[in-house]
Curated annotation (Swiss-Prot):
Superkingdom per UniProt: Bacteria
CDD domains documented for this protein: PRAI
Record NCBIfam families: PRK01222.1-4
Any one Pfam family match given in the protein's UniProt record, by short name: PRAI
Species: Citrifermentans bemidjiense (strain ATCC BAA-1014 / DSM 16622 / JCM 12645 / Bem)
Annotated pathway: Amino-acid biosynthesis; L-tryptophan biosynthesis; L-tryptophan from chorismate: step 3/5
Name of encoding gene: trpF
One GO-annotated biological process of the protein: L-tryptophan biosynthetic process
PANTHER family named in the record: N-(5'-PHOSPHORIBOSYL)ANTHRANILATE ISOMERASE
Protein name: N-(5'-phosphoribosyl)anthranilate isomerase
Length: 206
């Protein structure tokens, strides 16, 4: 069954709602230029209130390695998501499992995956203006082609209306959704979250 990560969590209310709806993982954005940014101390307070067995992911963009590792320790992160131009060597120095994000323009965007030995590869739509959370889609055929590299996490423009189609086509390890389930940047719509998770997970039941 495809796993679901709800990213851009900024409040305890949204975190607990997403977990209750069946989210497997929650994402916290530690990139100050993002409208979904949350500071490490604020994130840690939310994370301490979560029930067990929920994976906690920290998203970073071209951050200093020391900041990444300190934040991982402060927050008790299970996984670090790197959304910038971090090198394979940098990934190897992170003291957590790493999910490396790649912004997909076309098939040529997939060549770099082979250079990275990480826990998962997140594929997102390319945007010159943003490192994710744009609500834009890319050609899912590229995600299908990338599956030979390892665990694929599908992102980019997913919402309750198209996630079942995406899961049926790609059969990714997980889907990662932020703007597709929001009321406004950083605040989640409970109905959209519940519907998206149900749609993403129903494929395995058919």
């Amino acid at each position: 069954m495809t796993k679901v990560k709800i990213c851009g969590i900024t409040t305890l209310e949204d975190a607990l709602m997403a977990v209750e709806a069946g989210a497997d993982a929650l994402g916290f954005v530690f990139f100050e230029k993002s409208p979904r940014y949350i500071g490490p101390e604020a994130a840690a307070r939310i994370i301490r209130e979560l029930p067990p067995f929920v994976q906690v992911v920290g998203l970073f963009v071209n951050a200093e390695l020391d900041f990444v590792n300190r934040t991982a320790d402060t927050c008790g992160l299970d996984l670090v998501q790197l959304h910038g131009e971090e090198s394979p060597a940098y990934c190897g120095l992170v003291r957590r499992r790493v999910m490396k994000a790649f912004r997909v323009r076309g098939a040529e965007s997939l060549a770099a995956l082979a250079d990275y030995k990480v826990s998962a590869y997140l594929l997102d739509a390319y945007s010159p203006a943003s490192h994710g959370g744009t609500g834009e889609r890319f050609d899912w055929d590229h995600a299908v082609a990338a599956k030979g590299q390892g665990r694929i996490v599908l992102a980019g423009g997913l919402d309750p209306d198209n996630v079942a189609q995406a899961v049926a086509k790609v059969a990714p390890y997980a889907v990662d959704v932020s703007s597709g389930v929001e009321l406004s940047p950083g605040r989640k719509d409970p109905e959209k979250v519940r519907r998206l998770i149900a749609e993403a997970k129903k494929i395995a039941l058919i």
